Amino acid sequence: MINYSERIPNNVNLNENKTLQRALEQWQPSFLNWWDDMGPENSSNYDVYLRTAVSVDPKGWADFGYVKMHDYRWGIFLAPQEGEKKITFGEHKGQDVWQEVPGEYRSTLRRIIVTQGDTEPASVEQQRHLGLTAPSLYDLRNLFQVNVEEGRHLWAMVYLLHAHFGRDGREEGEALLERRSGDEDNPRILTAFNEKTPDWLSFFMFTFITDRDGKFQLASLAESAFDPLARTCKFMLTEEAHHLFVGESGIARVIQRTCEVMKELGTDDPAKLRAAGVIDLPTLQKYLNFHYSVTSDLYGAEISSNAATYYTNGLKGRFEEEKIGDDHKLQNSEYEVMDVAGDKILTRHVPALSALNERLRDDWITDVQAGVDRWNRIPAKFGFDFRFTLPHKGFHRKIGMFADVHVSPDGRLISEAEWTHQHKNWLPTESDRLYVHSLMGRCLEPGKFANWIAAPARGINNQPVNFEYVRFN
């Protein structure tokens, strides 16, 4: 018998719920088999300095200590219940939130939970080789922290499936462990989660940009009228903040190191900087363009009847719904979207309900831009003119209005011929990727960092930068 509060830290009264115990007991061995097969490569023996969620108390929700990842205590936590909580948007606005799934929304809610749940193991699979080329112990530990928390987020979604969706939910829980990122026959649900994450530059961009999509999706589900889903996502957001920090600070340290070498050598010539073993800023810009455009597609089409239905039915709200000053029903509201008309990109107003994907994408863009602005302080501090910019939202898109046209980063509609000629200046080329790949060698001495990345300003949980974050046995 498993001691539930110890083996699976939780605040869902697992000890009392025999049906749920049985379901999770069957699922747990499959999960551990998946982790051993598809989790971080060659890492089963490492003792890693990790935080583990142990409660939802803001002051002490996490414990830090050394743990083998296979033995990590993947817990199930929902943010605390809020008194007599009411639905805040859609046609049910003002009614009590739901503690059980209404029959008419059962299949839609299940699909929403499965789609979100599928991204969690997918990113672990995408990142499983990265430990073999970690630029430092500090970074290796951060990678593993992100991985175990993606694993915990999978547990959180599987808990909802098991607790509220009966046999269908149990089958979906198994299927979440059977799909594989990039697999031809049984891929992950969303395209971006079938892309490779071949190097640490891609990993930092992914955690900065694509995990930020996760933040906005979770935040809109945290508004849901289905209270267990809302509370689950609210607590997941607490952990997601560290993932975004890993990405933003990781790229900032790459920029810092490149600027140091630019100053030493008195040049911004990419060839000379590459000869010195750092990543030139234009190459970083190309990686930014790539990850930004691929992630933008995750929001779906600009005009979406699905998004309108989810909102009207109370299943998925807007980012920070309660802070928005409107009627929260949107029957008569409009929202501005871009449109391709002949050889021009115009804007037009459409019913706000149909443009909820675009609104969430715009909220995400504002947040990404704030991070890019922080990066731009680094070259400015060194006295360099280079600034990172986000490409036009029509650039390199495969979904929505811009799927069938070519748009340059500065927002011009261009011909197939110009795209073919120019895209190598805007997106990473094979030789860019090979160069970045050539820098990826393991650097595992405490306090030492690979040549292409600067040390962080401080360590994790008040530990020094040269702390032994991972012990190899």
From Swiss-Prot:
Q: Which reaction does it catalyse?
A: benzoyl-CoA + NADPH + O2 + H(+) = 2,3-epoxy-2,3-dihydrobenzoyl-CoA + NADP(+) + H2O
What triggers or suppresses the expression of this protein?
A: By benzoate.
Q: Which GO terms describe its cellular component?
A: cytosol
- Cofactor(s) the protein needs: Fe cation
Report the top EC class in one word. Answer: oxidoreductase
* Signal as UniProt keyword: no
Q: Which GO terms describe its biological process?
A: phenylacetate catabolic process
Domain of life where this protein originates: Bacteria
The cross-references to InterPro entries, in alphabetical order and at most eight, read: Aromatic_CoA_ox/epox, Benzoyl_CoA_Oase_BoxB, Ferritin-like_SF, RNR-like
Q: Does the keyword Transcription regulation apply?
A: no
Keyword line: Aromatic hydrocarbons catabolism, Dioxygenase, Iron, Metal-binding, NADP, Oxidoreductase
- Positions in coiled-coil regions: none
The molecular function terms in GO held by this entry are: dioxygenase activity; metal ion binding
What EC identifiers does the entry list?
1.14.13.208
- Biological role: The BoxA/BoxB complex catalyzes the aerobic reduction/oxygenation of the aromatic ring of benzoyl-CoA to form 2,3-epoxy-2,3-dihydrobenzoyl-CoA. BoxB acts as the benzoyl-CoA oxygenase, after being reduced by the reductase component BoxA. BoxAB does not act on NADH or benzoate.
- Report the PANTHER family cross-referenced here: 1,2-PHENYLACETYL-COA EPOXIDASE, SUBUNIT C, PHENYLACETIC ACID DEGRADATION PROTEIN PAA
Protein family according to the UniProt entry: Belongs to the benzoyl-CoA oxygenase component B family.
The annotated subunit structure for this chain is: Monomer. The subunit composition of the active BoxA/BoxB protein complex is not known.
Its name, as the record gives it, is Benzoyl-CoA oxygenase component B
Organism, per UniProt? Aromatoleum evansii (Azoarcus evansii)
Q: Which gene encodes it?
A: boxB
